[in-house]
């Protein structure tokens, strides 16, 4: 499974890593996962198109992951208000061509007022546009990741209870029951003994 392989490679050692990987594992930003992993382990240098982006993107190794980061970059580089940044995020998500042309001009003008070249501003806007279309908001990614972490903990440390509880939930769904029973067999036999 793709996400499992990404987790093996990333070796998350904190909840923030799980949250970021969860948010990255989506159609738009998925191609950034190898960069996230390489930057985490120092195999790739973390670079920022503008140093004002560093405090915003530091926790994700310079990669735009969350909708909130898009909004903060719009504020720091393009001079947007909070409300304006949220409108930009929404426009990017809807992919309205005319509105995006207008927003691009506003962003580049605001960036120029903050001594950012048009070339750099365009590059930053393109990154924002790419991620805002598919970006997850951080609180949703955190909630999903926390539940996934709890579920994994229960599966590893309280295996029998984990499978018993899940089987109770899907008793009337044959395919799901078979999948869970196979998973339980694999867990118990992989351990070489019955686990509690």
Feature locations, PLM:
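Noncatalytic, beta-rich nucleic-acid-contacting surfaces in large DNA/RNA-processing enzymes
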Residues: 1-196
């Amino acid at each position: 499974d793709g996400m499992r392989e990404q987790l093996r490679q990333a070796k998350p050692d904190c909840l923030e890593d799980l949250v970021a990987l969860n948010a990255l594992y989506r159609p738009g930003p998925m191609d950034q996962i190898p960069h996230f992993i390489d930057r985490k382990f120092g195999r790739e240098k973390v670079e920022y198109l503008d140093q004002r982006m560093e405090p915003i993107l530091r926790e994700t190794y310079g990669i735009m992951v969350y909708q909130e980061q898009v909004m903060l970059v719009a504020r720091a580089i393009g001079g947007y208000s909070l409300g304006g940044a949220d409108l930009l995020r929404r426009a990017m998500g809807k992919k309205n061509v005319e509105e995006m042309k207008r927003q691009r001009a506003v962003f580049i003008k605001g960036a120029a007022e903050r001594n950012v070249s048009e070339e750099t501003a365009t590059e930053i806007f393109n990154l924002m546009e790419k991620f805002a279309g598919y970006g997850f908001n951080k609180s949703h990614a955190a909630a999903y990741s926390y539940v996934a972490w709890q579920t994994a903990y229960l599966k590893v440390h309280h295996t029998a209870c984990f499978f018993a509880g899940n089987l109770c939930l899907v008793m009337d769904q044959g395919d799901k029951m078979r999948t869970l029973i196979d998973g339980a067999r694999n867990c118990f036999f992989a351990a070489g003994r019955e686990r509690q």
